[in-house]
Amino acid sequence: ELSVALYRHLLGLPEGEGSRDEPGAGQDLNLLCCDIDAELIERARSSSPFPASISFAQLDIMDSGAREPLLSSHLRRFGRAAFDIGFCMSVTMWIHLNHGDSGLVAFLAFLASLCRYLLVEPQPWKCYRAAARRLRRLGRNDFDHFRSLAIHGDMAARITEILTKDCAMDLVCCFGSTSWDRSLLLFKAKGWNPEDREPLERGCD
């Protein structure tokens, strides 16, 4: 599971080592992992070696009525107004295809308003075309918004433009490409420093 591997990586724990309750496992790192797939979440929850530190929740992130109470409650548990970092891995395309240009912008605005740092792995445009082809081969209709998307082409550049120009974030680093030819982009909230614990009041203009 990516979430467990990420937790181990952030704490420098070797594969297969212990649990969250063991000394040295890291007392201040807690992850909240969300996915729309309830079965996937249940499987991850039942197999997690760090149940005290990694929380799993089934969530449609585009459902504001569901996300607000869940995320606010999680932050209150730790007396925080925002997440230190958000990881958005291979998600942007699905948000974009199912909710259109406005949905993608709203999604990025929401993440920017709630995260001090944000690591994004945008799927390139060729993945959009491949997803549409797979759907057609299955005899199903195109994604509702695929043919009407005005945000297209170099998706890493377009997402960077949205976050930096409209959502009060700075691009800190591009970590190159993954084995799937996807960029890893790290953004930081403008004007924030590690000592700042005040609420973030930001979003896309």
How would you name each of these model-derived features?
Residues 87:
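A conserved beta-strand element that flanks and buttresses the S-adenosyl-L-methionine
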Residues 50-70:
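Conserved SAM-binding strand-loop segment of SAM-dependent methyltransferases
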Residues 44-45:
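Conserved SAM-binding loop
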Residues 109, 131-177, 185:
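Conserved Class I S-adenosyl-L-methionine
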Residues 30-35:
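Conserved SAM-binding motif I beta-strand of class I
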Residues 108-129:
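Conserved beta-strand signature within the Rossmann-like core of class I S-adenosyl-L-methionine
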Residues 67-72, 94-110, 114:
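A short, conserved alpha-helix within the catalytic core of class I
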Residues 1-26:
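Conserved SAM-binding loop of SAM-dependent methyltransferases across substrates and taxa
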